[in-house]
C-alpha cells in the first residue's frame, strides 16, 4: 500500500496558495484492507474512505470508463493493481494530476508543473471530452486563477467547444450546474467563468437568458460598451470588487435579463426592462434551484435599479413606497445589498469604473431618517388603528422630504 497527496493540495502548494482540503490517493489496497485499518467508507460509486483520526478523504486509485451520457455515466475500476499514473490519467487538468508521496517527492507524468509555471489550463488526455462537467470546472478554474495570469490551452478550449455542441451538457443535473455557478461567484473574477462559457458555446446551452444579451445594443451615451452582454459581465466584475456576498454578485449578473426582450424597433432603448426581466429571473432560479435569498434580491435589483439610479429625482413618497415594498424596515441588510448591486451596475460601463455613486449615500440617509420615526410617539399622540400606519407613512415621507431639501 502506497499513499499519495493528490490534486488541489499539491497544485495550491506549488502556487504558494492556502491549502483548504487535502485529498489522498491509495495505490495497492483493497476496501477490506482500508476498513481493517479503521478507515470509514463513504463513497458509493467508488471506494472513498475517511481517515479514522483526521477525517481526511482517502480514495483508492481507480480508472474510469465511459458507459452512458452525462457526468455520472462511468464504470469504475478500483482494483489494487491500478497504478498511480493510471489514476492521474483520468483527471481533468494537468495541474490537477500531480501527486506527492510522504517524503515530499512529486510525480508529474503529464507535465502539470510546467503548465503551472506557464499558467496554462490544459487537459490531461482526450478522455476529457467524456465528462461534460469539466467544461464548467475549467471555466471555474479560469475564474479562480485569473489574477495569476492563467489561460486555457487552445486545444482544451477546442474540446470544451466540442462538448458544448454534443448535447452532453444537457445531461448535467441542475444541482451540479448550480454548484459550479456558486463556486465561480466566490472567485475574484466571476465574470471570467461566463466569458469562457460564452467562448466555448456552453453559455447558450446552460444559461440562454444570459447568452441572449450578447449583441443587444444599449444607448452609447450611457453605455460606451454598447453590448448588453458585455455590460453584464462588466457589472459582475464590479460587483466582485465591491462585495464578497454571492447574493449581490448573482443579482448583478441577472439584473438586465429583460433587455433581451426589448422590441427591436425600440433599440437601443430598453423601457421597462427591469420589470420584463422578472419572469426570466424566476424561471432561471427555479431551474437551478437557486436559494431564495439570491432569488429575492435578484428580483428586487431588477425591479428597482432604475429607481435607485434616479434616486435624486424621486419624490419623497416614492422613496418611502420603495422602502415599504422591499420591506427594508425588517430587512435593512437587503438595502445595503441593493445599493451595492446598483453601484456595480453604474460602474460596469466603459469609462465609468471609477465614477462615484452618490445615490447610495443619499438613499442611506433617507432610510436612516425614515427609520428614526417613532411608532411609539405616534401612538402616544393618540392615533389608533389604521391611523397609526397612515401617520407613520406620512411622518416617514416628511423625514425623507427634509433630507431632499437639505441636499437641494
UniProtKB/Swiss-Prot annotation:
Enzyme Commission numbers on file: 2.7.7.72, 3.1.3.-, 3.1.4.-
Gene3D superfamilies on file: Beta Polymerase, domain 2 (3.30.460.10), cca-adding enzyme, domain 2 (1.10.3090.10)
One Gene Ontology biological process: RNA repair
Binding positions for CTP per the UniProt entry: 8, 11, 91, 137, 140
Keyword Electron transport: no
UniProt KW keywords: ATP-binding, Hydrolase, Magnesium, Metal-binding, Multifunctional enzyme, Nickel, Nucleotide-binding, Nucleotidyltransferase, RNA repair, RNA-binding, Transferase, tRNA processing
Residues that bind ATP: 8, 11, 91, 137, 140
Signal peptide bounds: none
Residues annotated as domain HD: 228-329
Domain of life (superkingdom): Bacteria
Cofactor(s) needed by this chain: Mg(2+); Ni(2+)
Other comment: A single active site specifically recognizes both ATP and CTP and is responsible for their addition.
Biological role stated in the UniProt entry: Catalyzes the addition and repair of the essential 3'-terminal CCA sequence in tRNAs without using a nucleic acid template. Adds these three nucleotides in the order of C, C, and A to the tRNA nucleotide-73, using CTP and ATP as substrates and producing inorganic pyrophosphate. tRNA 3'-terminal CCA addition is required both for tRNA processing and repair. Also involved in tRNA surveillance by mediating tandem CCA addition to generate a CCACCA at the 3' terminus of unstable tRNAs. While stable tRNAs receive only 3'-terminal CCA, unstable tRNAs are marked with CCACCA and rapidly degraded.
Subunit structure: Monomer. Can also form homodimers and oligomers.
Family the UniProt entry places it in: Belongs to the tRNA nucleotidyltransferase/poly(A) polymerase family. Bacterial CCA-adding enzyme type 1 subfamily.
Protein name as catalogued: Multifunctional CCA protein
Organism: Shewanella piezotolerans (strain WP3 / JCM 13877)
Gene: cca
Amino acid at each position: 500500500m502506497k499513499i499519495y497527496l493528490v490534486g488541489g493540495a499539491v497544485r495550491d502548494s506549488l502556487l504558494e496558495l492556502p491549502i483548504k482540503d487535502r485529498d489522498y490517493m491509495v495505490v495497492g489496497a483493497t476496501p477490506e484492507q482500508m476498513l481493517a485499518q479503521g478507515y470509514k467508507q463513504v463513497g458509493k460509486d467508488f471506494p472513498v474512505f475517511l481517515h479514522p483520526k483526521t477525517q481526511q478523504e482517502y480514495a483508492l486509485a481507480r480508472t474510469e470508463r465511459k458507459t452512458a451520457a452525462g457526468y455520472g455515466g462511468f464504470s469504475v475500476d478500483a482494483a489494487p493493481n491500478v497504478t498511480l499514473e493510471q489514476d492521474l490519467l483520468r483527471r481533468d487538468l494537468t495541474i490537477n494530476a500531480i501527486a506527492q508521496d510522504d517524503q515530499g517527492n512529486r510525480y508529474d507524468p503529464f507535465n502539470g508543473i510546467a503548465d503551472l509555471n506557464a499558467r496554462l489550463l490544459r487537459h490531461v488526455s482526450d478522455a476529457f471530452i467524456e465528462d461534460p462537467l469539466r467544461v464548467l470546472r475549467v471555466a471555474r478554474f479560469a475564474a479562480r486563477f485569473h489574477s495569476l495570469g492563467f489561460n486555457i490551452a487552445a486545444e482544451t478550449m477546442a474540446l470544451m467547444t466540442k462538448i458544448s455542441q454534443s448535447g452532453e451538457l444537457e445531461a448535467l443535473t441542475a444541482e451540479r450546474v448550480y454548484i459550479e455557478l456558486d463556486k465561480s461567484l466566490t472567485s475574484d473574477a466571476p465574470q471570467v467563468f461566463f466569458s469562457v462559457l460564452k467562448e466555448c458555446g456552453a453559455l447558450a446551452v446552460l444559461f440562454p437568458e444570459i447568452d441572449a444579451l450578447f449583441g443587444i445594443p444599449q444607448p452609447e451615451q450611457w453605455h460606451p460598451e454598447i453590448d448588453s452582454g458585455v455590460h453584464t459581465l462588466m457589472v459582475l466584475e464590479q460587483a466582485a470588487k465591491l462585495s464578497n456576498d454571492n447574493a449581490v454578485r448573482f443579482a448583478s449578473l441577472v439584473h438586465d435579463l429583460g433587455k433581451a426582450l426589448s422590441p427591436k424597433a425600440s433599440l437601443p432603448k430598453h423601457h421597462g426592462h427591469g420589470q420584463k426581466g422578472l419572469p426570466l429571473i424566476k424561471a432561471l432560479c427555479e431551474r437551478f434551484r437557486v436559494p431564495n435569498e439570491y432569488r429575492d434580491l435578484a428580483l428586487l435589483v431588477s425591479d428597482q435599479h432604475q429607481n435607485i439610479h434616479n434616486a435624486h429625482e424621486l419624490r419623497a413618497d416614492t422613496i418611502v413606497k420603495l422602502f415599504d415594498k422591499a420591506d427594508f424596515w425588517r430587512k435593512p441588510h437587503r438595502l445595503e445589498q441593493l445599493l451595492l448591486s446598483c453601484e456595480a451596475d453604474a460602474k460596469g460601463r466603459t469609462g465609468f469604473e471609477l465614477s462615484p455613486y452618490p445615490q447610495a449615500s443619499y438613499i442611506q440617509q433617507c432610510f436612516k431618517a425614515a427609520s428614526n420615526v417613532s411608532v411609539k410617539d405616534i401612538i402616544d399622540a393618540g392615533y389608533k388603528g389604521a391611523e397609526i400606519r397612515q401617520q407613520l407613512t406620512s411622518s416617514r415621507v416628511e423625514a425623507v422630504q427634509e433630507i431632499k431639501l437639505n441636499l437641494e
